[in-house]
Amino acid sequence: MTLTLLPAVDVADGLAVRLVQGEAGTETSYGDPREAALAWQRDGAEWIHLVDLDAAFGRGSNRDLIAEVVRSVDVAVELSGGIRDDDSLDAALATGAARVNIGTAALEDPEWVRKAIDRVGDRIAVGLDVRGTTLAARGWTREGGELYEVLARLDADGCARYVLTDVRRDGTLTGPNVELLRAVTAATTRPVVASGGVSSLEDLRVIATVPGVEGAIVGKALYAGAFTLPEALAVAAEVPAAGAP
């Protein structure tokens, strides 16, 4: 199998945006999120990583618009942002998203997350958003525990996969934290999706060689024109992913 690429569509105040290091106030707007998602579909994406930033930051939500984005495309969607209880989880699943990412709740409400994993299974991934080895919560504004302790607990709870983001690299075009990727994939048998810092096609080639990594989320590099999605998909196709089944 090849490395799965997930172009990102982050939504804030009804617009597709990108942040630098996940910080509110650093947004660059890229217009209608539906158009952004459809553009990635036209370019060959098989997955889209869709994030409700307002819900993640606890400052509102774009729930109806997010559902419209999911309905507007014919590809699989991984949905993230503000999924912290049964209501928000059920609403996220009801959009038709193939998979949902739980972040803050995995750190603040582990019992609920365990029950959610029992109920929904592999439609749940847990987002591990990291500074150093400390997890970040609440839209990356608070500390949320030690990475490897949380990872061991989630493995025991049956989590199917993880989305690993180095917050310090996200939106910076400075390259992925490959050392962190290798450390996390060595600590779990579950597949990992890499996120944060991808800036070049060579970065994707390197990520694909890390055992345990099945995919990569790509955001700013695409929006900034560092490479095109068809170019990235061609690279992914030529380098078999070490972590793909």
UniProtKB/Swiss-Prot annotation:
Active site, UniProt feature: 10 (proton acceptor), 129 (proton donor)
Keywords, comma-separated and alphabetical: Amino-acid biosynthesis, Cytoplasm, Histidine biosynthesis, Isomerase
Reaction catalyzed: 1-(5-phospho-beta-D-ribosyl)-5-[(5-phospho-beta-D-ribosylamino)methylideneamino]imidazole-4-carboxamide = 5-[(5-phospho-1-deoxy-D-ribulos-1-ylimino)methylamino]-1-(5-phospho-beta-D-ribosyl)imidazole-4-carboxamide
Annotated S-S bridges: none
Subcellular location: Cytoplasm
EC number: 5.3.1.16
The protein's name: 1-(5-phosphoribosyl)-5-[(5-phosphoribosylamino)methylideneamino] imidazole-4-carboxamide isomerase
Organism: Parafrankia sp. (strain EAN1pec)
